[in-house]
């Protein structure tokens, strides 16, 4: 018992003598803003399918080449009166190449139009992604970045217009589903 008390006292004394390092030359600032509610996406554009169609893999001449432009829009309503402009951000999995393009996926079942083997195996196209552009100036809208800002009218409505296109992300594009 005496041994435990002496050991505990020695440990306590060691901790009291231990040096402490404090940094006094740095400052952390937290900044932010509490905003009004957001605009609402209209029901006719909240869940939409943008058909890019069937495109030959030979339509792509190299990395960055584009095919099959398709226009689509996202309409907003009930925007707060304090807002004068709106933008959207698209999210998803980025295509290989890291240029802000959306990766294409694999169909869920072999009955989907991705089964080009006849074996019941679902196949996704490779070497291709989906690139989104602002229709107003044809600038790219990269994943997780704001689109071009669109004016909100006096009724609290706005329509943001875009173009989606397939983009070659690799020199070799293979056939398959490109959803």
Locate each region found by the language model.
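Mature extracellular/passenger domains of Gram-negative fimbrial/pilin and adhesin proteins
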Residues: 2-8, 19-179
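Short, Gly/Pro- and small/polar-rich lid/capping loops
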Residues: 14-17
